[in-house]
């Protein structure tokens, strides 16, 4: 597919075909599955989404971050086609395969740090975090999880507890998972004037030591840059101080 890389509106929004599809959707799709935009996508190329009415939109979300190299990127299309022709799917925990091992090798070889590295792959970020917490609790024998103000981690029961905002994802869904504590995040625009990243990290560490106790902490989960929380970039030195 080769779409002109610009916004083009051919009908009102939503167009008649999208409205028809939306009526069909309301009859069969759970109301719990929301949609931000009232348009139904028919195709995509590069940074452009095309709906069923022929309107073209610039995808500023990059498919929610997972297609930063563009829609229908030819290298990706070729790789998917090659793999689908080779075999479609088998469960790695039943009958493993080489591409999984190769992907783990690629990931771990590019990770920083002088320590043994291993990887596991999951479908979503929330699923990955559920497993992170399970692994950390098993490995440490501890149960407490530390997260940070303004964080967003997912929509499972555990990750909704790890989110900073209760609304909209956690509204009316209690009780959520326990043993999760939110610590103050470095937020240069809101922190006291002149607070450094190191000072913000020590603030969080001191809070967790008092609130949780280092001997109870299984893991600390943090977004290096917070997206849904407000595009918050911590002050320089915050992450490295936490890491130490």
Which stretches of residues belong to each language-model region?
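Short, small-residue-enriched loops and turns at beta-alpha junctions
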Residues: 66-68, 96, 189-190, 227-229
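Glycine-rich loop-to-alpha-helix module at the N-terminal edge of alpha/beta enzyme cores
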Residues: 2, 6-10, 56-142
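PLP-dependent aspartate aminotransferase-fold enzymes
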Residues: 105-219, 237
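Short acidic, glycine-rich surface-loop motifs adjacent to enzyme active sites
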Residues: 214-231
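Catalytic PLP-binding core of fold-type I/II PLP enzymes
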Residues: 214, 232-244
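Active-site and channel-lining beta-strand-loop segments
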Residues: 38-60
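Gly-rich Lys/Arg/Thr-decorated short loops/hinges at beta-loop-alpha junctions or inter-strand turns
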Residues: 30, 84-88, 179-193, 224-226
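Active-site-adjacent loop/helix segments that line or gate small-molecule/cofactor pockets in enzymes
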Residues: 2-45, 95, 100, 200
């Amino acid at each position: 597919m080769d779409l002109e890389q610009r916004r083009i509106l051919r009908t009102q929004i939503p167009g008649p075909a999208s409205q028809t599809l939306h009526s069909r959707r309301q009859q069969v799709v759970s109301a719990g599955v929301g949609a931000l935009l009232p348009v139904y996508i028919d195709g995509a190329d590069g940074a452009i989404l095309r709906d069923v009415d022929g309107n073209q939109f610039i995808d500023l979300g990059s498919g929610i971050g997972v297609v930063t190299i563009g829609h229908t990127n030819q290298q990706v299309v070729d790789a998917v086609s090659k793999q689908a022709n080779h075999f479609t799917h088998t469960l790695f925990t039943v009958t493993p395969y080489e591409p999984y091992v190769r992907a783990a090798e690629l990931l771990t070889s590019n990770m920083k740090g002088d320590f043994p590295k291993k990887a596991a792959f999951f479908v979503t970020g929330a699923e990955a975090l559920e497993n992170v917490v399970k692994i950390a609790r098993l490995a440490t024998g501890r149960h407490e999880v530390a997260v940070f103000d303004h964080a967003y981690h997912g929509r499972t029961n555990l990750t909704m507890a790890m989110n900073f905002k209760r609304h909209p994802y956690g509204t009316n869904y209690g009780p959520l998972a326990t043993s999760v504590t939110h610590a103050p995040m470095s937020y240069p625009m809101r922190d006291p004037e002149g607070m450094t990243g190191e000072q913000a990290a020590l603030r969080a560490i001191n809070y967790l030591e008092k609130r949780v106790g280092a001997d109870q902490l299984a893991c600390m989960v943090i977004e290096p840059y917070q997206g849904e929380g407000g595009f918050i970039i911590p002050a320089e030195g915050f992450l490295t101080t936490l890491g130490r």
